[in-house]
Amino acid sequence: MGVANDSSPEYQWMSPHRLSDTVILGDCLYFNNIMSQLDLHQNWAPPVRLLNYFKNFNKETLLKIEENDYINSSFFQQKDKRFYPINDDFYHISTGGYGIVFKIDNYVVKFVFEATKLYSPMETTAEFTVPKFLYNNLKGDEKKLIVCAWAMGLNYKLTFLHTLYKRVLHMLLLLIQTMDGQELSLRYSSKVFLKAFNERKDSIKFVKLLSHFYPAVINSNINVINYFNRMFHFFEHEKRTNYEYERGNIIIFPLALYSADKVDTELAIKLGFKSLVQYIKFIFLQMALLYIKIYELPCCDNFLHADLKPDNILLFDSNEPIIIHLKDKKFVFNERIKSALNDFDFSQVAGIINKKIKNNFKVKHNWYYDFHFFVHTLLKTYPEIEKDIEFSTALEEFIMCTKTDCDKYRLKVSILHPISFLEKFIMRDIFSDWINGGN
């Protein structure tokens, strides 16, 4: 039997580094550097002791803290211009249905709770193995349009995240109750709490209180105040009522400039585009070329990302032209940014079959499934596309669907257009700015 390397489908089943019941894929140095800054075993006193602690404060004592000059600007929300990461901490930047994401220095760290009863640890590696496999097999600049994780740790104990969330939630509850002169209690209504938190989170007085209480009560280098309401929705969702937040994966990524959905007209022009619509054409074209080149690879005409949408496309600096050859044409991108496909958690390619999606798809799909969903989400994210009649009319060719064959933008029926459909589409004058360098 030959030796499997990371350009082979078998790579996902390899276990290069073992630490008891955990596995590290990729660069151990990156991974261990991040892990050395995390305390996976941090514990706190029971909530009742926190309640007793807050009995030492009232509206008057909180007022004295508010009058203090000290303020930790990292407790502002990240979209607030006053936000500044003054410590080398983990800053919460996103929580979605399948991961909790933090930023530290030039890294992005994603924690994913896995259903260990459904999948073995090695069956949850697609987010690392699929992009790595594609990057190593693609031969041209198209490989630059993929986000590869630097490292991935499998089967790590992640209970500390849920414990930390509960500790911060209790602190916020008791702090808000003290501010309002209410009787202290750890019982709460989701609607009432979120309303109270959202009303205060941008207040400089509230941030001063957080600057005092977060270090004293939480004493952690993980700051979850940013976008805390997203974390709240994740952990409090009724479908996770009996969920065991036990084990999962830790993935280390390079830090991007933005996700594609964050670009508006002002930012598009700042990035060097003539308009927002030109920027949208740019990301569409780069993703289309990536798919075409993947489908050219042997045995890769089954590639599915399964969640191709603007917020799963990241933008990075591009220090040199990206040139991609297709038949007798070459596509030249001189922009100072590039788009790169991210979040391969539900993807499959070649012999790397993903059990997470295998049972969800009742019919066979190919690239068209992804682009049908992509176009729907582009039009929803950017209604400005409609102003470009030629472009918007062309995009409608991807979404000629009805309620019977499309549910929440996702195809329910098998439509297997050949990849030549996409090849012909991107040869149109719509993309003339990039075809043969715009000549």
From Swiss-Prot:
Occurrences of domain Protein kinase (ranges): 87-439
InterPro entries: Poxvirus_ser/thr_kinase, Prot_kinase_dom, Ser/Thr_kinase_AS
GO terms for cellular component: host cell endoplasmic reticulum; host cell endoplasmic reticulum-Golgi intermediate compartment
Disulphide linkage map: none
Leader sequence segment: none
Active site per the UniProt annotation: 307
Localization terms from the record: Host endoplasmic reticulum; Host endoplasmic reticulum-Golgi intermediate compartment
Pfam family, one: Pox_ser-thr_kin
Listed EC numbers: 2.7.11.1
Domain of life (superkingdom): Viruses
Predominant location category: host cell
GO molecular function: ATP binding; protein serine kinase activity; protein serine/threonine kinase activity
Catalytic activity: L-seryl-[protein] + ATP = O-phospho-L-seryl-[protein] + ADP + H(+); L-threonyl-[protein] + ATP = O-phospho-L-threonyl-[protein] + ADP + H(+)
Changes after translation: Phosphorylated in vivo. Autophosphorylated in vitro.
PROSITE patterns: PROTEIN_KINASE_DOM (PS50011), PROTEIN_KINASE_ST (PS00108)
UniProt-annotated binding residues for ATP: 93-101, 117
Function: Essential serine-protein kinase involved in the early stage of virion morphogenesis.
Family: Belongs to the protein kinase superfamily. Ser/Thr protein kinase family.
Protein name: Serine/threonine-protein kinase 2
High-level lineage: Viruses, Varidnaviria, Bamfordvirae, Nucleocytoviricota, Pokkesviricetes
